Amino acid sequence: MEAISIFSDYQLQFFKRIGMKPKPIETLDDVSDVMKACSNVFSFENLDIVSNSCEPLNKDVLIKQVICNNQGGLCYKINTLLYHFLLEFGFKIHIIRGSVENQETHSDWNIPTGHMINIINFENRLYVVDVAFGCNLSLRPIPITDDGSEVVESCTGLYRVRKVENCVSGKYNYTHILEHRKLDSFLIESGKTWVTGYAFDPLLIVDNNNNNEKTTHQTLVQQLVIDDPTKEFSTKPLATKIVNDGSSFSIATLTANSFTLTDCKTGQKTKTNFDNDKSSFEQFNQHLISIFNLPPLKTIPPIFLN
């Protein structure tokens, strides 16, 4: 007689994709294990946008793209897949939309309401569960507090959430911000200062039951990224993820012009610049395959032809 699995087909697909042996996911430590496994596999990347191959999104499309076809994605893809995974394990979880602060100037907001975040309610406390904020990854749930007194540490830095007043982005008045800073071992002093990552309201829940791919929040956020006047994510290819060489963690970052490894502990960088001709596209694709385990781009984005 064939054994009856206690896991759904989607749960088994997700476990396989993140390279994790199936097990019940019941505690915050279990969620942390899943978040770490996600960071080992999922790349934060915008390749479908820069190659003009986007399609309307719902759960089935996301499974096809990220789980079956081994793609990565931005927050609206990866965090949504984690949402469905944890929801099937019975977690009280919902998705919200927040606004990311410009991580270079820290003076304005990038794409208001353009960041999709998971919030879980565990034992009557709220936590941020985000596996797709670039490589600023806490790798475990972050408690939502009033004063930011509970700090979570990962290989990428320190994270906290605190309550704020008069934090306005677009038409929204947010109630909380996520802040992050680098580890004490970081060699660049400015990196050890707390900065805002993004602002949000943990109770501003979006409807995630809509399966009409043309009108889902995932499709709407994707269109916000495409239409963003700064074109930060729509014209410049980017892939980034945490890599572990067995002794230390680094952040791998691939752009049209270069590949960079940044040591998470010290901030020291090793950078390889690509040739300034059409062979840079070939070098880009080689790194996509060898470092990020992503399928190569089939069409050349305009940035490589300039």
Curated annotation (Swiss-Prot):
* E.C. no: 2.3.1.5
Any idea which residues are catalytic in this one? C75 (acyl-thioester intermediate), H115, D130
Domain of life, per UniProt, equals Eukaryota
A GO molecular function for this record?
arylamine N-acetyltransferase activity
Keyword list (alphabetical) reads: Acyltransferase, Transferase
InterPro entries per the UniProt record, alphabetical: Arylamine_N-AcTrfase (IPR001447), Arylamine_NAT_domain_sf (IPR053710), Papain-like_cys_pep_sf (IPR038765)
**Pfam families cross-referenced by the UniProt entry:** Acetyltransf_2 (PF00797)
| Protein name in the entry | Probable arylamine N-acetyltransferase 3
Matches recorded under PANTHER family: ARYLAMINE N-ACETYLTRANSFERASE 1-RELATED (PTHR11786:SF9), N-HYDROXYARYLAMINE O-ACETYLTRANSFERASE (PTHR11786)
Among SUPFAM superfamilies, the record links this protein to: Cysteine proteinases (SSF54001)
